[in-house]
Amino acid sequence: MVRNKYYVVRKLADVIYALPVGQGVVRDYPVMQLGALEYDIVRKIDQDENPRKVFDELAISYMIAEEQRDSFWEDFCTAAEDLASCNIIQNYVVNEKLNSRTKMRRIKRFR
C-alpha cells in the first residue's frame, strides 16, 4: 500500500511550523535524537522548502534510482510519521512548555 506522500509531508510541515521557535528549528532542536533522514526532512522544511517537493528533492540528493523509490518512500514515510506523530518533536514542544510553566511557578513562589 502506497501512502500519500503529500498528506504525510503536509502533516509533518504543520507540526514543524507550529514549533514555538519558528525559523531555525534545526539549530534549536536536540539534533542528536534525529537519524540522518529525519534530520534532512526537518532541514529541508525548515529552509521554507515547499513540503510537496521534500520527498523528490531528498530522493535526488540521496541518488535514489527510479526503481528504488518505492523502498525509499517507505523509509521516508516512516521517518516523516515518527517526526509528525512526534515521538521526537512533540516531546520537545511539551518539554519546552513544561519548562516555561515550571519557571513561572518558581518565579511566582519567590516573589
Where are the model-predicted features located?
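Hydrophobic packing positions characteristic
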Residues: 1-14, 111
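Generic detector of short, locally flexible boundary/turn motifs and exposed helical patches
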Residues: 5-9, 19, 55-57
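Short alpha-helical segments that sit at the start of domains
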Residues: 9-40
